[in-house]
Amino acid sequence: MITIRSLRPNDYHAWQALWRGYLAFYKTELAEHVYRTTFERLCSNDITTQNAIIAQLGGEMVGLVHYIFHPHNWRVEDVVYLQDLFTAPQQRGKGVAKALITAVYHASDQAGCPSVYWMTQEFNHQARHLYDQIGQLTPFIKYTR
């Protein structure tokens, strides 16, 4: 059975291992201080815009999701950006990612936020199969600086 809960301060090493796996998928590496700072923000009671939820199977952390509440100029309510979602490779196909996204939907609803959005790379076919079932594909293209 999948257990979903908020990230806790004593989760650092298990969280870091999962996040490193996520970043490796996208061929990205970060400095150690970025891991520490991000983790501290995600666990902080003073920073309520950045959040993290983890999934456990048999007491082992097997998935994570990071999400951010932020204002939107076209709405009165905040919206939620689901920034990072990762399931340990050996646990894929067991409903972990869907459970994590559902938890973000629930947090968004509880906060009165009408919209949750996220991005993925075009080649991420396995994830896109799930996203096509629980979200709506938009025609937007992302640019960055």
Walk through the language-model features, giving the residues of each.
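Conserved GNAT acetyl-CoA-binding A-motif
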Residues: 109-119
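Conserved active-site alpha-helix within GNAT-family acetyltransferase domains
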Residues: 98, 122-141
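Conserved acetyl-CoA pyrophosphate-binding loop and the N-cap/start of the following alpha-helix
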Residues: 91, 95-103
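A conserved beta-turn-beta hairpin within the catalytic core of GNAT-like acetyltransferases
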Residues: 71-82, 92, 139
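Conserved beta-strand in the GNAT
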Residues: 54, 60-69
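Conserved GNAT-fold acetyl-CoA-binding loop/helix
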Residues: 19-41
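A short beta-loop-alpha structural element at the N-terminal edge
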Residues: 3-17
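A short helix-loop-beta-strand connector motif used in the catalytic cores of GNAT acetyltransferases and
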Residues: 42-54, 81
